[in-house]
Amino acid sequence: MMWGAGRSMAWFSAGSGSVNVSIDPAEEPTGPATLLPSPRAWDVVLCISGTLVSCENALVVAIIVGTPAFRAPMFLLVGSLAVADLLAGLGLVLHFAADFCIGSPEMSLVLVGVLATAFTASIGSLLAITVDRYLSLYNALTYYSETTVTRTYVMLALVWVGALGLGLVPVLAWNCRDGLTTCGVVYPLSKNHLVVLAIVFFMVFGIMLQLYAQICRIVCRHAQQIALQRHLLPASHYVATRKGIATLAVVLGAFAACWLPFTVYCLLGDANSPPLYTYLTLLPATYNSMINPVIYAFRNQDVQKVLWAICCCCSTSKIPFRSRSPSDV
């Protein structure tokens, strides 16, 4: 992906002190003789990352869709996350093709909108999963009810409507194709649009941080109550609780490590920022879509059973599934 300005500019703004216009659209040759830009090493890396992300999440989507037992609210949320990450992976691959194989700036613009939608939906789905985990512990007695299913559909609708809104904005109007000085670090997204996306991320991250803190308090309180009822040694429930809290810390830490660098850079950078910095911060963000299937799907024992059945060419209809809470996902 070319991160400069002009017709061949795809995502990144380039330059060191001034906007780099590599090709003047008025002087650009037309027809079959038009030369396509050559991909750089990091363009290829992003394309490969997109391919891996697509394969992983396509497997998760296929498992959830093809297994009737996976119709619980928690799997609907995990499925939404997998669809969003699958869309992000496909967007990265198709964006590479649009820039270096087809050379279509219109298609490139649409795909940037698709990527904005996909990544926003991915982050929103993570928030929905966190909310579901919290409610499953806070309202454990009433969690398995029709209200939970309705709430899940409402959360998914809000996530995807909001993501579509933020993704369609640059495609329909709010972009910097006609005014490069208003560009942010990701062409053709304007600086103001990137600021809005960054604010949305920090709001989501803050809510997730607060919810995970509440989850840790609930888990510690439940562990103490169970230990008292079963007359367990304090050390035994302390080890189990510490393990659970460590898992939550890893989940939240991975999310922050993947997205914080790019989000902060979107706020601090502008059209004159070196494109390499955008690649270096965007790549970890794509890795979040790569590790989400591992954290939220492949760790689940029921999903593992289906995977083993697929590998052994066995039917999944006879697999004994057990009821699990969202905190297990």
From Swiss-Prot:
One cellular-component annotation, GO: cytoplasm
Gene3D superfamilies assigned to the protein according to its UniProt record, in alphabetical order: Rhodopsin 7-helix transmembrane proteins
Tissues/organs with expression: Abundantly expressed in granule neurons at all development stages. Enriched in the longest tips of neurites during differentiation of hippocampal neurons.
Keyword Cytoplasm among UniProt keywords: no
GO molecular function: sphingosine-1-phosphate receptor activity
Keyword annotations: Cell membrane, G-protein coupled receptor, Glycoprotein, Lipoprotein, Membrane, Palmitate, Phosphoprotein, Receptor, Transducer, Transmembrane, Transmembrane helix
GO terms under biological process: adenylate cyclase-activating G protein-coupled receptor signaling pathway; G protein-coupled receptor signaling pathway coupled to cGMP nucleotide second messenger; negative regulation of cell cycle; negative regulation of cell population proliferation; negative regulation of meiotic cell cycle process involved in oocyte maturation; negative regulation of oocyte maturation; positive regulation of cAMP/PKA signal transduction; positive regulation of cold-induced thermogenesis
Residue ranges, Extracellular side: 1-43, 95-108, 175-192, 269-277
Pfam families assigned: 7tm_1
Matches recorded under CDD domains: 7tmA_GPR3 (cd15963)
Residues with PTM Phosphoserine: S323, S325, S327
Subcellular location: Cell membrane
Main location: membrane
Glycosylation sites recorded in the entry for this protein: N20
Function noted in UniProt: Constitutively active G-protein coupled receptor that maintains high 3'-5'-cyclic adenosine monophosphate (cAMP) levels that a plays a role in serveral processes including meiotic arrest in oocytes or neuronal development via activation of numerous intracellular signaling pathways. Acts as an essential activator of thermogenic adipocytes and drives thermogenesis via its intrinsic G(s)-coupling activity without the requirement of a ligand. Has a potential role in modulating a number of brain functions, including behavioral responses to stress, amyloid-beta peptide generation in neurons.
Family of the protein in this entry: Belongs to the G-protein coupled receptor 1 family.
Record-given protein name: G-protein coupled receptor 3
Source species: Rattus norvegicus
Recorded name of the encoding gene: Gpr3
